[in-house]
A protein has these predicted regions:
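Short basic helix-loop element that most often maps to the first helix and adjoining turn
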Residues: 6-25, 50
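DNA major-groove recognition helix of helix-turn-helix/homeodomain DNA-binding modules
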Residues: 46-61
Length: 76
C-alpha cells in the first residue's frame, strides 16, 4: 500500500510531528510506525481506523481512494 505510506508521511509532516510523537499517541513503537511509513508493514484494520482518527481524515483519504484535504493556512 504505497499510497498509504506516502499519505502517512505527508500527514505527519504537515503537522510537524516526529515519528516518535505519532507512535506515542497511537500507543505503538516508533519502529512500527516507521515501517508503516516506509511501506514495510501494513497496519491492521483497527490501526487504520486509529490512524485516520488521529490525522482527522477518512479511511478513503488515508488509503488514497479520495484526495487528502488541503492543508489549512494554520499548517494543519
Amino acid at each position: 500500500m504505497e499510497i498509504l505510506s506516502l499519505n502517512l508521511f505527508a500527514l505527519r509532516k504537515r503537522r510537524g510531528l516526529s515519528r516518535e510523537a505519532v507512535a506515542r499517541a497511537l500507543e505503538i513503537s516508533a519502529m512500527t510506525y516507521q515501517r508503516y511509513e516506509k511501506n514495510l508493514r501494513d497496519p491492521a484494520a483497527p490501526m487504520l481506523l486509529k490512524l485516520a482518527d488521529f490525522y482527522g481524515v477518512s479511511l478513503d483519504q488515508l488509503m488514497g481512494r479520495e484526495p487528502l484535504p488541503e492543508p489549512s493556512e494554520k499548517g494543519d
